[in-house]
UniProtKB/Swiss-Prot annotation:
Transmembrane stretches, start-end: 22-42, 50-70, 72-92, 121-141, 149-169
Biological role stated in the UniProt entry: Plays a role in cell envelope biogenesis, maintenance of cell envelope integrity and membrane homeostasis.
UniProt family annotation: Belongs to the YciB family.
Listed name of the protein: Inner membrane-spanning protein YciB
Stored NCBIfam families: ispZ, PRK00259.1-2, PRK00259.1-3, PRK00259.1-4
């Protein structure tokens, strides 16, 4: 249910873009994000930090898009968000000495430190690559292609990378965890 709530604003953005334009879609994205955030809080009494960061970015960049009537801001949001995620992963590994991925999943999974580090670094690189891809698609291709890439391309890439990560984790799990 939480994943559906996280995905809902993106669907709203896509629908409003196809029906109207990037500015109406940006406004709808802000509203849908705030509604999803409120619903998540009311239902679970907890909102994940990543969701809060994403909502803050939507609010800031969406508002700038509307205030300056420029799609540059909403296009940059994706890259800035992905770079922030990558930086959080890298700082957790190199400065705080415990990968963020391990902090998030370590209670459920027992994996060697090297596996946690590799997984954490892989996700950081993934986010940086997606951020760079977004810059290319957003600023060198037509807006329609960027919207489709943002909604479907990045979602598909994230799903594929999640599956690859799952296979990698499974290969390194202790046998007793694989059985349960």
């Amino acid at each position: 249910m939480k994943q559906l709530l996280d995905f809902l604003p993106l669907v709203v953005f896509f629908i409003f873009y196809k029906m109207y334009d990037i500015f109406v879609a940006s406004g709808a994205l802000i509203v849908a994000t705030l509604v999803a955030l409120a619903f998540t809080w009311l239902k679970y009494r907890k909102v994940e930090k990543m969701t809060l960061v994403t909502a803050a970015m939507v609010l800031v960049f969406g508002t700038l898009t509307l205030a300056f009537h420029s799609d540059l801001f909403i296009k940059w949001k994706v890259t800035v968000l992905y770079v922030l995620f990558a930086l959080a992963l890298l700082v957790s590994q190199w400065v705080m000495k415990k990968p963020l991925i391990q902090r998030m999943l370590g209670k459920e999974l027992t994996l060697p430190d090297k596996v946690w580090s590799t997984l954490n670094l892989s996700w950081a690189i993934f986010f940086l690559v997606c951020g760079l891809l977004n810059i290319y698609v957003a600023f060198w291709l037509p807006q329609d292609i960027w919207v489709n890439f943002k909604v479907f391309g990045l979602t598909a890439l994230t799903l594929i990378f999640t599956l690859i990560s799952g296979v990698y984790i499974y290969r390194h799990m202790p046998e007793e965890q694989k059985k349960s």
